[in-house]
């Protein structure tokens, strides 16, 4: 069901994770955020090929985790979430996805991309 929203709770509130397509992707993929550079928010899209436990985290340039956007099991599909950096300073940030197929103890897919916050 397109545009089905799933909410993930964290310390900064509820973050919507939208299923933008239920078409099952052939592979896992972390897309480039848009816009980039951004202020104060940017869209992050990713594809999940199999039912998986997904973590999507944001790190600063020193490698410190500044936000966890997703930490839950997701069904196959194409997803989008919004990263709001309203309370963060300008600079380079990295977003990392870590996917573990449901029932597996080993990682299935991991990728990291760079984004720039300009205030």
Regions found by a protein language model. Name each.
Residues 75-79, 89-92:
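A glycine-anchored, Pro-Gly-centered beta-turn/N-cap motif
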Residues 4, 81, 113-114:
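Extracytoplasmic/periplasmic beta-strand context in beta-sandwich domains
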Residues 66-74:
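Solvent-exposed serine/threonine-rich low-complexity stretches and specific carbohydrate-binding patches
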Residues 1-21:
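Short, compositionally biased serine/threonine- and acidic-rich segments at solvent-exposed termini, linkers
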Residues 17-59, 68, 80-85, 98-106:
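Glycine-centered coil/turn sites that cap beta-strands in beta-rich domains
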Residues 90-119:
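C-terminal tail/sorting-segment detector
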């Amino acid at each position: 069901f397109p545009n089905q929203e799933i909410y993930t709770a964290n310390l900064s509130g509820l973050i919507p994770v939208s299923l933008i397509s239920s078409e099952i992707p052939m592979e896992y993929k972390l897309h480039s955020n848009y816009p980039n550079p951004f202020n104060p928010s940017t869209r992050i899209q990713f594809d999940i090929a199999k039912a998986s436990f997904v973590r999507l985290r944001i790190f600063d340039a020193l490698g410190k985790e500044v936000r966890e956007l997703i930490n839950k099991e997701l069904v196959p599909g194409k997803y989008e979430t919004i990263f709001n950096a309203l309370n963060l300073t300008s600079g380079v940030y990295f977003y990392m996805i870590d996917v573990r197929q449901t029932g597996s103890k080993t990682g299935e897919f991991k990728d990291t991309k760079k984004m720039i916050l300009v205030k």
